[in-house]
């Protein structure tokens, strides 16, 4: 009987991608089958994230639950991967000696060897090195069960913003060769994937080697991806404003398959705070790029990241952030109160903003962006949207679910499931707090 693998994932889309590749890897090497029940698993993997506060405590809390399973089944293998693993290394086993494997984002491709070593030699393994692109050289082609898929085109970040641990946990920027990226996307298209989301911690810093020895940037890569047969929708995330280039803006005019949605983290609307964060740009430079983009795509949906309560942030600084939000009209954000991450330069700054002020500012910010989101959703009522049907509605088996270009979930009634994985036109009939409702336009499907 095949061994069972359970993976619990914290964090970003890159971690979701990495977890899927772990499953592909061990499926090929050890014929394991995924399970959603940790109690029946032979291998437990925890893919961790260190971006937010108390990340380590969250990891050890989960490992404490798994310790009981290990006591019941001494042959159970427990592995910890991701950014907390990269950051903590041997310290994870010092605190949780029942953990068998510790590996970073750049060494997950070595999982088969780790599993063999632990299973046969009973020797725990810790490998949190940064072997650059070797990870992708040794991963099998991915499998996909849906019409949308993530494709990692680069790893790491070289920006070293003062608040961020990513350069220390995932390493410097390393881009995958163009041919490898296109081959993976073509493989996914052959499995029925219609939408790809190009991933990277700083994806618009992509500089991929071509087969003739030149380098290709993200704008050129998007043009190539658009030519892959079967791929009809392209997204990318996450971007940095400094490298949101003119050529990338121009590609929105030349590649219709690139969605009218952009997530461009700004973190703050105060130049003084941006300087303390070492973001490398001003608010004016950020807004200028968005204005030029809006000239090309007037209907583009814009989202961002915000940190409130960064050390030294005053009421005036926060007001400037709100002014930026009101000027741009973001319709979604990932927003958090500041918490110091160990080993980052900002951790040495005096955290002089009270928790009460942080929470109050966050509530104000999130409420304003929610208002923008609801306004945009209401304006979509009556319009016809091209929807990629992704599956059955979670709340009603008689309905199907899909996403618009601007990343809104749409539920609509359908007697047939044959259109799952296809594009259909849906007229929006209602805007709900977290989704849209619609009616399919039967004569127009793709």
UniProtKB/Swiss-Prot annotation:
The keyword Cytoplasm belongs to this UniProt entry's keyword annotation: yes
Domain TRAM residue range list: 378-442
Key word Iron-sulfur present: yes
Enzyme class: transferase
Annotated positions binding [4Fe-4S] cluster 1: 12, 49, 83
Catalysis performed (reactions): N(6)-dimethylallyladenosine(37) in tRNA + (sulfur carrier)-SH + AH2 + 2 S-adenosyl-L-methionine = 2-methylsulfanyl-N(6)-dimethylallyladenosine(37) in tRNA + (sulfur carrier)-H + 5'-deoxyadenosine + L-methionine + A + S-adenosyl-L-homocysteine + 2 H(+)
Broad class of the protein's primary localization: cytoplasm
UniProtKB keywords: 4Fe-4S, Cytoplasm, Iron, Iron-sulfur, Metal-binding, S-adenosyl-L-methionine, Transferase, tRNA processing
InterPro entries: Elp3/MiaA/NifB-like_rSAM, Methylthiotransferase, Methylthiotransferase_CS, Methylthiotransferase_N, Methylthiotransferase_N_sf, MiaB_methiolase, rSAM, rSAM_horseshoe
Protein localization: Cytoplasm
Binding annotation for [4Fe-4S] cluster 2: 157, 161, 164
EC number: 2.8.4.3
Top-level taxonomic group: Bacteria
Cofactor note: Binds 2 [4Fe-4S] clusters. One cluster is coordinated with 3 cysteines and an exchangeable S-adenosyl-L-methionine.
Cofactor: [4Fe-4S] cluster
All residue ranges annotated as the MTTase N-terminal domain in the record: 3-120
Subunit structure: Monomer.
Family from the record: Belongs to the methylthiotransferase family. MiaB subfamily.
HAMAP family given in the database record: tRNA_metthiotr_MiaB (MF_01864)
Purpose: Catalyzes the methylthiolation of N6-(dimethylallyl)adenosine (i(6)A), leading to the formation of 2-methylthio-N6-(dimethylallyl)adenosine (ms(2)i(6)A) at position 37 in tRNAs that read codons beginning with uridine.
Protein name: tRNA-2-methylthio-N(6)-dimethylallyladenosine synthase
Organism (species): Hahella chejuensis (strain KCTC 2396)
């Amino acid at each position: 009987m095949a061994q069972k693998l359970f993976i619990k994932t914290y964090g970003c889309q890159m971690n979701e991608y990495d977890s899927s590749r772990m499953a592909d890897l061990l499926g090929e090497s050890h014929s394991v089958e995924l399970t959603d029940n940790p109690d029946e698993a032979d291998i437990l993997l925890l893919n961790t994230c260190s971006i937010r506060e108390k990340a380590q405590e969250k990891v050890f809390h989960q490992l404490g639950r798994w310790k009981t399973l290990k006591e019941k089944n001494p042959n159970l293998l427990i592995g910890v991967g991701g950014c907390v693993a990269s950051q903590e290394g041997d310290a994870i086993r010092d605190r949780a000696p029942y953990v068998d494997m510790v590996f970073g984002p750049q060494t997950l491709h070595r999982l088969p060897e780790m599993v063999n070593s632990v299973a046969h030699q009973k020797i725990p393994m810790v490998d949190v090195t940064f072997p650059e692109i070797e990870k992708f050289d040794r991963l099998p082609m991915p499998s996909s069960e849906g019409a949308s898929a993530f494709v990692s085109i680069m790893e790491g970040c070289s920006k070293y913003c003062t608040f961020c641990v990513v350069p220390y946990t995932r390493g410097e920027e390393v881009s995958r060769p163009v041919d490898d990226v296109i081959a993976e996307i073509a493989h996914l298209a052959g499995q029925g994937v219609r939408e790809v989301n190009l991933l990277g911690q700083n994806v618009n810093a992509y500089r991929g080697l071509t087969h003739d020895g030149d380098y290709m940037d993200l704008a050129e890569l998007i043009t190539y991806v658009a030519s892959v047969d079967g791929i009809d929708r392209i997204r990318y995330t996450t971007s940095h404003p400094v490298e949101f280039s003119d050529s990338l803006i121009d590609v929105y005019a030349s590649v219709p398959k690139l969605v009218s949605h952009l997530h461009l983290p700004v973190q703050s609307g105060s130049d003084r705070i941006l300087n303390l964060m070492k973001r490398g740009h001003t608010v004016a430079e950020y807004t200028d790029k968005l204005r030029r983009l809006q000239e090309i795509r007037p209907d583009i949906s814009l989202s961002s990241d915000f940190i409130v309560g960064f050390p030294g942030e005053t009421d005036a600084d926060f007001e400037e952030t709100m002014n930026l939000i009101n000027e741009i009209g973001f319709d979604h954000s990932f927003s958090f109160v500041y918490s110091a991450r160990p080993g980052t330069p900002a951790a040495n700054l005096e955290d002089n903003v009270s928790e009460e002020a942080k929470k109050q500012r966050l509530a104000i910010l999130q409420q304003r962006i929610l208002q923008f989101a609801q306004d945009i959703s209401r304006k979509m009522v009556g319009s016809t949207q091209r929807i990629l049907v992704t599956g059955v509605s979670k709340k009603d088996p008689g309905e199907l679910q899909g996403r618009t270009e601007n990343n809104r979930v749409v539920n609509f009634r359908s007697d047939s499931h044959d259109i799952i994985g296809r594009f259909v036109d849906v007229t929006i009939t209602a805007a709900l707090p977290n989704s849209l409702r619609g009616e399919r336009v039967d004569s127009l499907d793709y």
